[in-house]
Amino acid sequence: MRRHLSLFLGSLVIGLALLIAPAASWAYPFWAQQNYDSPREATGKIVCANCHLAKKLTQAEVPQSVLPDSVFTASVRVPYENGLQEIGADGSDVGLQVGAVVMLPDGFTLAPQDRWTDEIKEETEGVYFTQYSDEQPNILLVGPIPGDEHQEIVFPVLSPDPATDSNIHFGKYQIHVGGNRGRGQVYPTGDKSNNTIYTAPASGTIASIEPGDNGASVVSIKAADGSSVSETIPVGPEVLVSVGDSIEAGTALTNDPNVGGFGQVDAEIVLQNPVRIYGLLAFFAAVALAQIMLVLKKRQIEKVQAAEGV
């Protein structure tokens, strides 16, 4: 019930955002939240790539190892050139927004705010975290947020404690990370956005280019057999063809306005058993003590030999 309610509220927010602020660019990880039980397919692909078709660099940084019941940060970098703009839903130039998804191992969750350090509070200012679902608190989402201010997104994470949860074990785990900047090229419905290239659906000759609704252009193509087919190009992409041009199916009718893209990366983290650390420290201490004893013994022998005139 709570999941259905959260999905309904998410749909309502999306609808209002598109109606009230159509010029805003989007990088909504919760598109995936509403359409997929898990953001990662069996192939390993994060589903955001189904709508954000361009591949871009995403970087992740996590500690090599952490202790049980400790707070650490996972940083996701979504780099792009500052000040870069893209085509908004209404065809105007808008700044890029970013979003990220972090799939933590089972048991790892968003750290409670009362355990955030002052540094974490400063690094996460203006960032709102949500979990993928009530059943998956280990999958965290952020976005959309202004990209120029948040090209690095810091996730405060709480590690689990095997002493209090028998399902958790010490060892090495994988973290799956996805990061996006800018709008997608395809909506979850399968429809194209105005942030993508449009191509000819058939071979033939450009018969006409007429204005359509809301600033769109309707390109009519007359095929060799006399039939006609049209392609509606929304406001935003630049039409590259002219009336009378001969084209083949798949020929680009517009430029590609997209400047954003999605990337994913995996990272590894070790949930370290503190007993092993204590044992390792004890071993190092024993080795150091043995070295000291050997040095002292050697000096003692040298003194005895010197006294005996050897």
Curated annotation (Swiss-Prot):
Coiled coil: none
Record membrane topology: Single-pass membrane protein
Compartments, record wording: Cellular thylakoid membrane
InterPro entries attached to this UniProt entry: Cyt-f_TM, Cyt_f, Cyt_f_lg_dom, Cyt_f_lg_dom_sf, Rudment_hybrid_motif
Keyword Lipid biosynthesis annotated: no
Biological process per Gene Ontology, one example term: photosynthesis
Transport in keyword set: yes
Transmembrane segments: 277-297
Cofactor: heme
UniProt keyword terms in alphabetical order: Electron transport, Heme, Iron, Membrane, Metal-binding, Photosynthesis, Signal, Thylakoid, Transmembrane, Transmembrane helix, Transport
Gene Ontology, cellular component aspect: plasma membrane-derived thylakoid membrane
UniProt: heme binding residues: Y28, C48, C51, H52
One of the record's GO molecular function terms: electron transfer activity
Stated role: Component of the cytochrome b6-f complex, which mediates electron transfer between photosystem II (PSII) and photosystem I (PSI), cyclic electron flow around PSI, and state transitions.
Quaternary context: The 4 large subunits of the cytochrome b6-f complex are cytochrome b6, subunit IV (17 kDa polypeptide, PetD), cytochrome f and the Rieske protein, while the 4 small subunits are PetG, PetL, PetM and PetN. The complex functions as a dimer.
Family label: Belongs to the cytochrome f family.
UniProt name for this protein: Cytochrome f
Organism field: Synechococcus sp. (strain CC9605)
Encoding gene (name): petA
